[in-house]
Curated annotation (Swiss-Prot):
GO CC field: transcription preinitiation complex
Organism domain of life: Archaea
Region ranges (Disordered): 51-73
Species of provenance: Ignicoccus hospitalis (strain KIN4/I / DSM 18386 / JCM 14125)
Keywords: Metal-binding, Repeat, Transcription, Transcription regulation, Zinc, Zinc-finger
Task performed by this protein: Stabilizes TBP binding to an archaeal box-A promoter. Also responsible for recruiting RNA polymerase II to the pre-initiation complex (DNA-TBP-TFIIB).
NCBIfam families hit by this protein: PRK00423.1 (NF001658)
Gene: tfb
SUPFAM superfamilies: Cyclin-like, Zinc beta-ribbon
UniProt similarity note: Belongs to the TFIIB family.
Pfam families in the record: TFIIB, Zn_Ribbon_TF
The protein's name in its UniProt record: Transcription initiation factor IIB
Record-listed Zn(2+) binding positions: 11, 14, 30, 33
Length: 316
């Protein structure tokens, strides 16, 4: 590094060791007499800075980043499926046959064991399911890590890959406070709900996953966004949720059902037209659930002052 190099230099004119480095000109200059001690210095170090060993290791690594969502973490190479050479020209029939044969052998080299085959299928399925649910990268990676641990402990054996993948996705969503109900996941991914629930309970128990308790508050932004509600309505619903949080009426109830009922109350108070059926479909619950939770919550809110809640929201 230039700073370290400066300590070893000495001015040939005055003998001073107080040498400074000029980053703009690439010169080492004596701070006492101004003599240029060394010029045209080329810094061989990296152009980035790192403040921790972990950051230095991460930024210093060359090549593509490792990813748990790929069965081999992305370490192996893949022969391009397009039959073209480096200049973009199509290969001759003879060359295409040769490349096809190389692809086959390369695939066999990548997938050698039963675990490799399982992970290849599972990671492809995970990618497909995560795209259907519009999940962010961090949840996909969390789900992939959980699945790998389940494979290592032999929890996948005898169970369908689709059900296990759906279960680890549900667990990853819970861990990252991304509200997704089992019913929603089972419906969108077209898997058996009971089987997914069974796999989820097994995985969380055997892997000792610390999954936070589902919070109805987490469901409100998702439902509000899906219904394209105004920001003030969502904020009003969250204020209502704060008022009833911890109340006995919420104990043992489905968080999605409570959130749906609170959203319904908020849209009614704000004069927005939304039906119970519409809200229930988005929340992944039944109309009956929304109706029952609505009645219970309204009894509690009637003891409070809804206008006071609205004033609190308006002040912000």
């Amino acid at each position: 590094m230039p700073e370290q190099e400066a300590f070893r230099l000495r001015c040939p004119v005055c003998g001073s060791t107080d040498i400074v480095f000029n980053e703009e000109t690439g010169e080492y200059v004596c701070a006492r007499c101004g003599t240029i001690v060394l010029d045209r210095y080329v810094d061989q170090g990296p152009e980035w800075r790192a403040f921790t060993p972990e950051e230095r290791e991460r930024r210093g690594r060359t090549g593509a980043p490792l990813s748990p969502t790929l069965h081999d973490h992305g370490l192996s190479t893949v022969i391009d499926h397009r039959d073209r050479d480096a200049l973009g020209k199509r290969l001759s029939p003879r060359k295409r046959q040769e490349v096809q044969r190389l692809r086959k052998w390369q695939l066999r080299a990548r997938i050698q064991t039963g675990m490799d085959r399982n992970l290849t299928i599972a990671m492809n399925e995970l990618d497909r399911m995560a795209n259907l649910l519009n999940l962010p990268k961090q949840i996909k990676e969390e789900a992939a890590v959980i699945y790998r641990k389940a494979v290592e402990k032999g929890l996948v054996r005898g169970r369908s890959i689709e059900s296990v993948v759906a279960a680890v996705i549900y667990a990853a969503c819970r861990i990252h406070h991304q509200p997704r109900t089992l019913d929603e996941i089972a419906k969108k991914l077209e898997v058996n709900r009971k089987e997914v629930a069974r796999c989820y309970r097994l995985i969380t128990k055997e892997l000792k996953l610390k999954v936070p308790i589902a919070d109805a508050m987490d469901h409100i932004p998702r439902i509000g966004e899906a219904l394209k509600l105004r920001g003030d309505i969502i904020e009003y619903a969250m204020k209502i949720m704060e008022k009833i949080k911890g109340h006995p009426i919420t104990a043992g109830k489905d968080p999605a059902g409570i959130a749906a009922a609170v959203i319904y109350i908020a849209v009614m108070q704000k004069g927005e037209r939304r039906t119970q059926k519409e809200i229930a479909n988005v929340a992944g619950v039944t109309e009956v659930t929304v109706r029952n939770r609505y009645k219970e919550i309204m009894k509690v809110l009637n003891e409070m002052d809804l206008e006071e809640i609205e004033k609190e929201v308006s002040k912000k």
